Amino acid sequence: MNRRVRPQYDDSDESGVEYESGHDEMEEISFGALNSAQKKIKNEDEKKWSRRNNSNNDSDGEEGDFFESDSDGPPEESSSKTSDQKTRSKHAPAEASAKRPVSRIRQIPGLETKDNSKFGDIRFDPAFGKANEERIRKDYSFLNEYRQSELEQMQRMLKDKKLSRSMSPRERQELELQTQSLRSRLDSMKNKDLEAQVLAEHKKQQKEKWKSGQQAAPYFLKKSEKRKLLQKAKFESMKAPQREKVMERKRKRRLGKEMRQLEFGRK
C-alpha cells in the first residue's frame, strides 16, 4: 500500500506570510485615516480618565461629609442654606443686604428737618440761634462793591454801540435782564441797611432819654409808626429826580382813587 505523506510547514514560514500580509494592509491605509484614528483613541482615553476622576471625587466627597459632619465647614453651610430656603415661608419678610453706603445726613428719630435746610450753611442754622443780620451785613459788605462794579461793567457793555451790534437780540435781552435784576438787588440791600440804621438811631435816642430821665420808659414803635418813619427816611435819602417820580406816582394813585369813588357815587 502506498502511503500519502503530508507536507510539513515550519511556523516561521507561516508567521512570515502573516507579517507580509499585515504589512501590505498597513501600506494601503492613508495617512489621514491614521491621524483620525489616533485622535479618536485619544478622545476616548480622555473621557475614560475624566469619568474615573469624577467618580473618585464623588466618593471622596461622600466620605468627607460622613466623617466631617460635626465640623463647621462649607458643606454644612451650603446644606443649612438649602434647608433655610426650603423651610422659609412665602409670607416671611424680605431680606436686604446690610452692605449699603452710610448717609451723610444722620437720621435722628423724632427730629424733623426741611428739605431745603439739609444742605444749608451751618452758620445760619436755626439750631445755633437767631442770625445776627447786622453783623452778617457788616462782615460781607465787600460783596456790594463787587456787585456795583459788575453793574457798571454791564451798563458800559449796553452803551457800547460796537459791542451791541456784535451781540444777538437774545444776548442783549439777557444782559438787560441781568442788569435790571442786579440793580434791584442793590437797591433792596440799600433800603434794608437804611431801615436798620433808622431803627438803631431811634432805639439809641429812646435809651438816652430814658437814662436822662426825660421818659419813664423807652417808647417802642408800632408797626404803622415804624412804616411812616421808614418812608420819611427813604424820601429824605432820595435825589431830586427820584423824589419827583415818587410824587408823580402818588399823585396818579390818588387821582385814580378819586375817579373810582366818583364812578361809584354816580351808580
Swiss-Prot record:
Its main location: nucleus. It comes from the Eukaryota. Residues 170-193, 242-263 form a coiled coil. Residues 59-75 have a biased composition (Acidic residues). One of its GO terms (cellular component) is 90S preribosome. The keyword Nucleus applies. Keywords: Coiled coil, Nucleus, Ribonucleoprotein, Ribosome biogenesis, rRNA processing. GO terms for biological process: maturation of SSU-rRNA from tricistronic rRNA transcript (SSU-rRNA, 5.8S rRNA, LSU-rRNA). It is found in: Nucleus, Nucleolus. Residues 112-124, 160-175, 201-211, 233-247, 256-267 have a biased composition (Basic and acidic residues). The keyword rRNA processing applies. Residues 1-125, 160-188, 201-267 are annotated as: Disordered. InterPro entries: RRP36. Belongs to the RRP36 family. Component of the 90S pre-ribosome involved in the maturation of rRNAs. Required for early cleavages of the pre-RNAs in the 40S ribosomal subunit maturation pathway. Associates with 90S and pre-40S pre-ribosomal particles. This is rRNA biogenesis protein RRP36. It comes from Meyerozyma guilliermondii (strain ATCC 6260 / CBS 566 / DSM 6381 / JCM 1539 / NBRC 10279 / NRRL Y-324).
